[in-house]
Amino acid sequence: GVIRHQDIQHGRAEGIGNPVIYVGAATGKDGIHGATFASEELNEESEAKRPAVQVGDPFMGKLVLEACLELFQCGAVISVQDMGAAGLTCSSTEMAEKGGNGMELNLDLVPQRAMDMSPYEIMLSESQERMLLVAKDGREEEVFQICRKWDVPASVVGHVISEPVLRLMHNGLSVAELPLDKLLGSCPIYERKAVASELQLSRQQQNAVDWDLPEDLGALLKEMIIVPELASKQWIYGQYDSMVRTCTSVGPGSDAAVIRIDGTEKALAMSIDGNSRYVQLDPKTGSCIAVAEASRNVVCSGGNPLALTNGLNFGNPEKPEIFWQLREAVAGICVACESLELPV
């Protein structure tokens, strides 16, 4: 969506003593280590790790979204952050660090939908549809009233403290107290081995000039255009309504989609591009080409490329060959972005 600059909400835990409020679905045992699971190889033994997969609730997500939008307008909320990867651990530490303060949480007050959850499980659960707020002291009831209106659970689970630490209480005892700089700024950086595989090197040494052309190029063309990666994608995007909210100027099938911004004379041009075969042959060059292609498509639609985000999906980075591919792809994106002066 599109938001106004004055409506942007920040994730800074400010104001010593201000309450930390948990908003959204109860915490369960689903999603524990979900972020790390996303980078693991899947095999026959992966079935045992199904609890690492988060259980979504789209309806609750919509209620949380609407409740948060109203909360931001009432003036009682100072900051907000979603509970994404690492759940409460990530949201609480990042908010406290960005605010230049610390945070104390009472895990007994965290809404839970599973019995006998340990502090470890509560802090690392990645259950969906949850937000962490810092509200102005004394205005908690305003937050609760709005949450009740939208039938969204809410509970004060802690407060902002002056010490730069994350302090956790459970069953009346302090079970953890960690300095924020050790969790965030001073955390160790991986130094992994990166090696191009023999298969990768052999692919790069192949020369298309040495290949024999088939006698019937027409038959070859027919074979190529039925390959899903090369064929028209109309059969997919034609099943979806591309005119939702009636802001679409240029729909799917063009170089880039163009969406009007209501109330202005501006529009957004967006393109998603990438050629897996190029990246497979040469991750660095292939990634450069992907950025350049997306930029050209935006330009050909009348736009000016402003920024991009990546959709990198690789295998297990603990394998030297896989890490080499990832490293080279990032380097390729970097080269293209520096050349085109595009922030990532």
PLM features: residue spans?
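Glycine/proline-enriched, intrinsically flexible loops and inter-domain linkers
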Residues: 1-343
